[in-house]
């Protein structure tokens, strides 16, 4: 006999979800025939008795290339999904500016995965902020979160007015049901929920816990990076991004809407589901992306290029070439460079780097960086291959090698990432991380050959 949780998981998994390909397209979709008006946005009376409503992700007068809005045709207008809010608290979800009081000194930091929950937690309850950067009130910067949970958001719904959420599952697949449709998101995939978009999260599959990472982007929205001399192809190709088709709930049962606004949390009880959009059209919408479709480029003769070539998505700042936050992927790839130290080189950086590992092993760290783990290398703090990685790359035969079984990523921002107290006191913090470089001995002996013994 299947238990209630197993039946739920099987029912969700049996859904064959449909998607529309493309990045930033002007989409149109309806879940009932004739629900989408033709030739206009706001008819005097919408079919099916629906309400027309615009969701704006940019100012009305933003340039055409960055102007984002969608028209939604819904069972009730969003004013009916609100009421008299009451303040609530998610004590582990922090927002910039947030300078925490803790005893941990400055340094390069690394953590093992979050421990599994001891009680029942849904997606929202399982979010733990590791770092914050910038200022949500001026809409710049980001926060890096980890999550771990083991229960569905059944009648709980949420939207974030502070920024868009880039969700990176590491263990356990998710069904993310948004106002504009459903997305199934497995490890090695990502999804993005735009600022202000209502959603809930359910579990797919059988795991003890569902775990992953979130980048909360307070600033300009994520977009595809310019390819420059690379040309029209490779990296993340627009056709591989998938936006969900319209889907809705028409249920009248006690539900709870929760909102994050300027770092504070609020809740209101309503008597129906707010996921009631029957049809929509526009370019402000959620999407998912399979990281395995990322087409990397790299050095094919010598040297190691800058990690910016691995940028999947970038959220620009007001300064050209300087990101508010980048989402960078280190995927499987061939290493073929001649007379070259092939791993990422030793580095001090104006940008601040938060890293995670989805599966496998990261080529610059032979040991200690595990799936579900995290590392933080803040601005101008030195980092690079550990001793074992250096020895292997320095003495190994330089034949073509496929770097396989790896999927690491980075949230990189122009702002220093401030550690939360939770992160500073987390039991999985590796006290010995700094020792991974202790074996890098002096090889200079005054001769051109050096001491490579």
Curated annotation (Swiss-Prot):
Keywords: Dioxygenase, Iron, Metal-binding, Oxidoreductase, Phenylalanine catabolism, Tyrosine catabolism
NCBIfam families per record: hmgA
Pathway assigned in UniProt: Amino-acid degradation; L-phenylalanine degradation; acetoacetate and fumarate from L-phenylalanine: step 4/6
Official protein name in the record: Homogentisate 1,2-dioxygenase
MF (Gene Ontology): homogentisate 1,2-dioxygenase activity; iron ion binding
Gene behind the chain: hmgA
UniProt binding sites for homogentisate: 362, 383
InterPro entries: HgmA_C, HgmA_N, Homogentis_dOase, Homogentis_dOase_bac, RmlC-like_jellyroll, RmlC_Cupin_sf
Pfam (any one): HgmA_C
Documented EC number(s): 1.13.11.5
């Amino acid at each position: 006999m299947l238990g209630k949780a197993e039946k739920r998981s099987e029912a969700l998994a049996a859904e064959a979800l449909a998607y529309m390909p493309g990045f930033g397209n002007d989409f149109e979709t309806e879940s009932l025939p004739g629900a989408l008006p033709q030739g206009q946005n706001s008819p005097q009376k919408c079919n099916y008795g629906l309400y027309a409503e615009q969701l704006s992700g940019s100012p009305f007068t933003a340039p055409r290339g960055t102007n984002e809005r969608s028209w939604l045709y819904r069972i009730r207008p969003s004013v009916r999904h609100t009421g008299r809010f009451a303040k609530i608290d998610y004590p582990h979800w922090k927002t910039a500016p947030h300078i925490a009081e803790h005893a941990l000194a400055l340094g390069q930091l690394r953590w093992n995965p979050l421990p599994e929950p001891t009680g029942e937690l849904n997606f929202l309850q399982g979010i733990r902020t590791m770092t914050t950067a910038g200022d949500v009130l001026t809409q710049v910067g980001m926060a890096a979160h980890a999550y771990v949970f083991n229960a569905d958001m059944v009648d709980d719904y949420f939207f974030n007015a502070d920024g868009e959420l880039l969700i990176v599952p590491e263990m356990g697949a998710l069904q993310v049901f948004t106002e504009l449709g459903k997305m199934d998101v497995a490890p090695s995939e990502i999804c993005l929920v735009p600022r202000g978009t209502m959603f809930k999260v359910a579990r797919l599959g059988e795991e003890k816990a569902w775990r992953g990472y979130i980048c909360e982007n307070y600033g300009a929205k994520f977009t595809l990076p310019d390819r420059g001399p690379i040309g029209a192809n490779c990296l993340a190709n627009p056709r591989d991004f998938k936006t969900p088709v319209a889907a809705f709930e028409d249920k009248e049962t006690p539900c709870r809407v929760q909102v994050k606004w300027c770092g504070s949390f609020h809740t209101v009880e309503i008597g129906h589901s707010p996921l009631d959009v029957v049809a929509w059209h526009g370019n402000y919408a959620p999407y998912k992306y399979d990281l395995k479709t990322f087409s990397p480029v790299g050095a094919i003769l010598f040297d190691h290029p800058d990690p910016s070539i691995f940028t999947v998505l970038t959220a620009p700042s007001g300064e050209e070439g300087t990101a508010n936050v980048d989402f960078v992927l280190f995927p499987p790839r061939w290493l073929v460079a001649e007379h070259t130290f092939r791993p990422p080189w030793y580095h001090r950086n104006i940008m601040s780097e938060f890293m995670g590992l989805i599966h496998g092993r990261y080529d610059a760290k032979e040991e200690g960086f595990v799936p579900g783990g995290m590392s933080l290398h803040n601005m101008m703090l030195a980092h690079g291959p550990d001793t074992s990685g250096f020895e292997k790359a320095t003495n190994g035969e330089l034949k073509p090698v496929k770097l396989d079984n790896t999927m690491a990523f980075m949230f990189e921002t122009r702002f220093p990432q401030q550690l939360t107290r939770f992160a500073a006191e987390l039991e999985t913090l590796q006290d010995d991380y700094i020792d991974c470089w202790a074996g890098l001995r002096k090889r200079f002996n005054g001769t051109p050959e050096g001491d490579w013994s």
